[in-house]
Curated annotation (Swiss-Prot):
The chain crosses the membrane at residues 28-48. One of its GO terms (biological process) is very long-chain fatty acid biosynthetic process. Belongs to the short-chain dehydrogenases/reductases (SDR) family. It comes from the Eukaryota. NADP(+) binds at V79, D134, N161, K196, Y228, K232, V261, S263. Its main location: endoplasmic reticulum. It catalyses: a very-long-chain (3R)-3-hydroxyacyl-CoA + NADP(+) = a very-long-chain 3-oxoacyl-CoA + NADPH + H(+). It comes from Mycosarcoma maydis. This is Very-long-chain 3-oxoacyl-CoA reductase. One of its GO terms (molecular function) is very-long-chain 3-oxoacyl-CoA reductase activity. Its EC number is 1.1.1.330.
Length: 350
């Protein structure tokens, strides 16, 4: 009788009508059916939410963060790190077209000058500033130079794009100290230091957007890229903590959970439905600001590209984590073998 009463209580709690003529076994089956229906419903709602975020629901307007195409003298500034190639360059170009003045931060003064000239030619009236920093060095004088460059600017957007991965998949024990330290200095330390420089002003002005370039390697931990994966996992947790801290000051934080994009970092040259060009990717990001996309249920995180969003949803809600680790390990081992073979052939033909 106690079991029957307990099941009755559970059924009432989930809103199911109780038939007191049911046996305990029958009632248990009804309860399990209810739980199953709830699980399937939740599963379906998450999928619907994904498609709505990616294809239907509008994102935040960039005017929320100070874009002003009509009067660029009153427009806010966007600071973009890693701004001379790939995704970073595309963010700089598109944010300028949206009505922001641009601070370009990257390693090469020559490339910085080239991208600044490109922006000013394409979007007359947009002002640019440049700052050369080799983030791997952790040079205090270079950080002071950036601080001087942004001092007094009304910065509405910060794009922490700069990043570094391993030259090829490698076990942690075989990773060189130089490569390991470069990855942490670029992917973690630079993000913290630049953000600490910029975000207090956003908080004071009660307006801002911080976009941190993440990676699937930080969500689905990637063997053979352990240090890189760990650096991106850090960004995921840090972005969520930061987002909660500054949201009451109207500063929006979003970790962009990114799968493959055509870029120097990914070493991929051909685009597809699953692998966008930087232009396609950034267009989608700016169109869906404030939406989670495939990062359903993860605060301050977005997976905006449709193909990436589906992979994110599947790896989160469908595929077993242990299987993913094993599969990813096998893929990275194969990638390493191909890279070593290619390097060996290059040496022989030299």
């Amino acid at each position: 009788m106690a079991i029957e009463q307990h099941i009755d209580g559970l059924l009432r709690h989930v809103g199911l009508r109780v038939d007191h003529g049911l046996t305990p076994v029958s009632a248990s089956l009804v309860l399990l059916a209810g739980i199953g229906a709830l699980s399937v419903g939740t599963f379906a709602l998450r999928l619907v939410r994904l498609f709505a975020d990616v294809y239907i629901l509008p994102g935040n307007s960039v005017s929320k963060y100070g874009a002003n195409k009509k009067d660029l003298t009153r427009a806010s500034w966007a600071v973009v790190t890693g701004a001379t190639d790939g995704i970073g360059r595309e963010f700089a170009l598109q944010l300028a077209r949206k009505g922001f003045n641009i601070v370009l931060v990257s390693r090469s003064p020559e490339k910085l000058g080239s991208v600044a000239a490109e922006i000013e030619a394409a979007t007359p009236g947009v002002r640019t500033k440049t700052q050369a920093i080799d983030f791997a060095l952790g040079d205090e004088r270079q950080y002071e130079g950036l601080e001087h460059t942004v001092k007094g600017l009304n910065v509405g957007v910060l794009v922490n794009n700069v990043g570094k991965s391993h030259n090829m998949p490698v076990t942690f024990t075989e990773t060189s100290e130089e490569e390991m330290e470069d990855i942490i200095e670029i992917n973690v330390v630079s993000v913290l230091r630049v953000s600490k420089m910029i975000i207090p002003g956003m908080v004071d002005r009660k307006r801002g957007l911080v976009l941190n370039l993440g990676s699937f390697a930080g969500q689905v931990t990637t063997p053979m890229l352990a240090t890189y994966a760990g650096s991106k996992a850090f960004l995921s947790g840090w972005s969520q903590a930061l987002g909660e801290e500054v949201k009451r000051s109207n500063v929006d934080v979003s970790l962009l959970n990114t799968y493959f994009v055509v870029s120097n970092l990914s070493k991929i040259r051909k685009s597809s439905a699953m692998i966008p060009t930087p232009k396609q990717y950034v267009t989608q990001v700016l169109k869906t600001l404030g939406r989670n996309g495939g990062a359903v249920g993860r605060p301050y995180t977005a997976t905006p590209w449709p193909g990436h969003a589906l992979v994110d949803w599947a790896t989160t809600f469908v595929l077993p984590r242990g299987w993913l680790l094993s599969y990813t390990y096998g893929q990275q081992v194969a990638t390493r073998k191909r890279a070593l073979n290619k390097a060996h052939k290059a040496v022989k033909s030299a």
